[in-house]
């Protein structure tokens, strides 16, 4: 939305150029013709601009050799109705067209770039076939089927959970909390410019295994581990205290996160809700299996899982009230940590069927990958837990190649809009870097039980 006002700047510049050209060539100054030529040139300029942004982001490297984790937020209602919103729609359309095309790798094959991450907001003006911007949602569905992006935020559900606000996450799923103390000049809640101080994740499976199925002991150990996490989060917070704005002028002095003076510390930004700090959690499924012998999808285990989530939130609220630091519960992405946690559990407790017998533990509140459940039921079930992860979480559904069944993708998007705040469709978008095969590559277990890719071609 921040780019949208500049589209009309280009439009006026191009229109002036078209008029000058027609005067020089002695052609008639017909407004309809001038507007048609202007809009055609404008579309080309927007296309070129979006392509430039994409290529600059994926070729820019951070100090540790990674592409920056940038999230592009596509929300039509962030700008006023009329020309500016239509210009934003043009930008969104081009962003998705560029992503559908992909980028060429060294073999000259169009592949899916990992970044920037795209988030598309589903709202009243784009969720039904008769809505004005339905064509963008159709394009988003096609893009998802081919490139696994964008991810989707339901404006309807987010407004219910976030005091009427709709705003992007940082990276893949870290959401700021709504803070009445943080407002823009117009009185609206402030999100852009705020940040997160870091995350510490509690291994809920370890808590359950340590309790050995004893419920009273479980709650005692959980509180002990939560206090350990609290101490670790305080270490992160205190490490930032005293940092002067000079260490990163773009962030702290030039407006990316704040406009502090030279030599001023960032301390005031660490309190009063300007930034958040996250209590992550992992392994809700395995926790229930160890304590109750049932998945958290079982009606008998679900209340226990929700009670644990509520305890995490209660602790964050308690710490926040005592320290004026904005603690929040966060569904940790895990990534490599899932393997690390699993290995540590096996070392401490051995192989427990259904609990520690895999080389991973389940991400946050997610339904276990081996459970038989349809996409709609999974989203509906997980939506109850997403409410209890105010610091961020995302739900996924796994689908086959959907490029020939876009209506089915659209039906999933409409279900997301009505039922869950933030979700993503994982489809197949594989490319073998050895032989160049472009198609579905299977995941198998090697001789050690580790999940590996197996190309059907080579």
Residue spans for each PLM region:
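Conserved catalytic cores of very large enzyme subunits
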Residues: 1-273, 294, 298-458
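Contiguous, well-ordered alpha-helical segments that form the cores/surfaces of helical PPI scaffolds
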Residues: 277-290, 310
């Amino acid at each position: 939305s921040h780019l949208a006002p500049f589209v009309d700047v280009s439009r006026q510049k191009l229109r002036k150029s078209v008029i000058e050209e027609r005067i020089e060539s002695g052609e008639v100054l017909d407004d309809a013709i001038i507007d048609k030529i202007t809009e055609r040139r404008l579309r080309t300029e927007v296309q070129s601009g979006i392509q430039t942004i994409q290529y600059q982001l994926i070729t820019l490297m951070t100090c540790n050799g990674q592409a920056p984790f940038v999230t592009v937020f596509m929300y039509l209602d962030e700008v006023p109705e009329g020309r500016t919103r239509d210009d934003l729609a043009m930008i969104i359309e081009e962003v998705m067209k560029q992503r559908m095309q992909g980028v060429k790798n060294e073999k000259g094959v169009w592949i899916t770039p990992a970044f920037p991450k795209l988030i598309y907001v589903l709202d009243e003006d784009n969720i039904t076939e008769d809505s004005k911007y339905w064509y963008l949602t159709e394009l988003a569905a096609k893009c998802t089927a081919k490139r696994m992006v964008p991810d989707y935020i339901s404006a309807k559900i987010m407004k219910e959970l976030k005091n009427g606000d709709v705003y992007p996450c940082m990276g893949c799923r870290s959401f700021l909390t709504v803070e009445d103390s943080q407002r823009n000049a117009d009185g609206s809640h402030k999100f852009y410019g705020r940040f997160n101080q870091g995350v510490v994740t509690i291994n809920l499976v370890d808590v359950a295994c340590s309790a050995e199925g004893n419920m009273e002991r479980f709650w005692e150990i959980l509180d002990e581990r939560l206090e350990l996490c609290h101490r670790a989060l305080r270490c992160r917070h205190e490490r930032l205290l005293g940092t002067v704005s000079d260490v990163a002028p773009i962030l702290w002095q030039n407006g990316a996160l704040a406009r502090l003076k030279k030599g001023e510390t960032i301390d005031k930004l660490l309190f009063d809700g300007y930034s958040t700090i996250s209590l992550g959690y992992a392994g809700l499924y395995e926790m229930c299996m160890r304590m109750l012998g049932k998945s958290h999808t079982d009606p008998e285990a679900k209340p226990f899982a929700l009670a644990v989530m509520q305890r995490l939130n209660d602790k964050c609220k308690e710490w926040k009230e005592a320290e004026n630091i904005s603690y929040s519960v966060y569904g940790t992405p895990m990534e490599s940590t899932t393997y690390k946690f699993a290995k540590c559990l096996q070392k401490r407790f051995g192989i427990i069927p259904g609990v520690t017998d895999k080389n991973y533990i389940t991400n946050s509140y997610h339904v276990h990958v081996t459970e038989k459940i349809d996409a709609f039921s999974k989203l509906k079930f997980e939506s109850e837990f997403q409410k209890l992860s105010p610091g961020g979480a995302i739900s996924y559904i796994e689908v086959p190649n959907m490029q020939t069944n876009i209506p089915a993708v659209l039906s999933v998007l409409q279900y997301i809009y009505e039922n869950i705040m933030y979700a993503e469709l994982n489809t197949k978008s594989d490319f073998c870097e050895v032989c160049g095969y472009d198609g579905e590559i299977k995941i198998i277990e090697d001789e050690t039980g580790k999940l590996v890719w197996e190309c059907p071609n080579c």
